[in-house]
A protein has these predicted regions:
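Extended, low-hydrophobicity, polar/charged segments
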Residues: 8-136
Length: 136
């Protein structure tokens, strides 16, 4: 169970490949926040193959120092892990592996993101994934 303490959470909702998700479209993370009556602001942006966290912050007007990216990795044990890091930072795979007690971790392949998390690249939230994964 994830404890949510924030009064205002910004979420990224995608306009993927020209499909307008519409005003009523909700992600699992949004449904969780709605259920707990936690206010949030949904930000939308176009997703392309070159999108990164810095670009998302720039086009949505979100402050870089308060923006994070969600990275999903798999350990040598085949266990999945979710890492939430500032968008301006790069992940150190050796430190990431040590933090979860693995010999090594690697990023999951882009084609597997939706199957594993339920989200698309560029819009992966640590909240509301298909399964509950250890989150660092």
């Amino acid at each position: 169970m994830i404890e949510i303490k924030s009064k205002l959470i910004s979420l990224n909702i995608l306009w993927k490949e020209g499909i307008n998700l519409g005003k009523e479209a909700k992600t699992n993370a949004m449904r969780m926040l709605d259920k707990k009556k936690i206010p949030y602001e949904a930000l939308t942006y176009e997703v392309d193959e070159f999108i990164d966290g810095m670009h998302c912050a720039e086009i949505t007007g979100a402050p870089v120092d308060a923006s994070y990216k969600t990275l999903v990795m798999q350990g040598k044990s085949k266990q999945y892990y979710v890492f939430v890091i500032p968008i301006a930072c790069e992940v150190d795979l050796k430190k990431a592996a040590r933090s979860v007690g693995e010999k090594s971790v690697e990023m999951i392949h882009v084609k597997d993101i939706t199957k594993i998390t339920g989200y698309v690249r560029g819009g992966c939230s640590p909240l509301g994934m298909k399964k509950l994964f250890p989150t660092v």
